[in-house]
Design a protein with these regions (language model features):
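Conserved aromatic anchor
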Residues: 1-6
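Short loop/turn motifs at secondary-structure boundaries
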Residues: 65-160
Length: 160
């Protein structure tokens, strides 16, 4: 900050959540060289600002800089509901998902599973009985926190 005759003690790059609360702060060199490594998986919209602290303790804040991250959404192509704790549930994965729907059908077009809960997946059962090993069709739709819509359709192999 050039307006302080006493000079700058330090600059901090701050990350703020959607409510404006600082959840990350890092001191940076006086040339303000800063780079972000990796995707922040907690916030889809990240607000950055620079906090300047003068040698006499005065504080000044920059304007906000907003970064909007794209959501992610995908489905597996196989699962093994055999009770071993590995890939027993067929469920969607993703980041920043707000709304969700999933429908699964057998090869005859009969519905075997449906949910609107992103955390819920298919356990490989039809009417509480183990489904036969086969290829099943699915259609999934998700909406992220920014309103972007993701649509997937394809097949899932149930392996025993």
């Amino acid at each position: 900050y050039e307006g302080w005759p006493e000079g700058v003690q330090e600059y901090l790059v701050e990350k703020l959540d959607e409510s404006g609360k600082v959840y990350f702060s890092q001191s940076v060199a006086k040339n303000l060289d800063y780079s972000e490594k990796g995707l922040d998986t907690n916030e889809q919209i990240i607000h950055f600002r620079v906090k300047g602290i003068s040698n006499s303790g005065r504080v000044s804040y920059s304007n906000y800089f907003e970064v909007r991250q794209k959501g992610e959404f995908y489905m597996p192509n196989a699962f093994t509901p055999n009770g071993d704790g590995l890939n027993d549930i067929c469920h969607a994965e993703g980041l920043f998902i707000k709304d969700f729907s999933l429908e699964i059908w057998d090869k005859n077009g009969a519905g075997v599973f449906a949910t609107n809960s992103f955390k819920q997946g298919w356990d490989g059962k039809i009417n509480d009985l183990p489904a036969p090993p086969d290829v099943y069709m699915y259609r999934a739709e998700a909406v992220d926190k920014l309103g972007f819509v993701y649509k997937l359709s394809g097949t899932i192999q149930l392996i025993k």
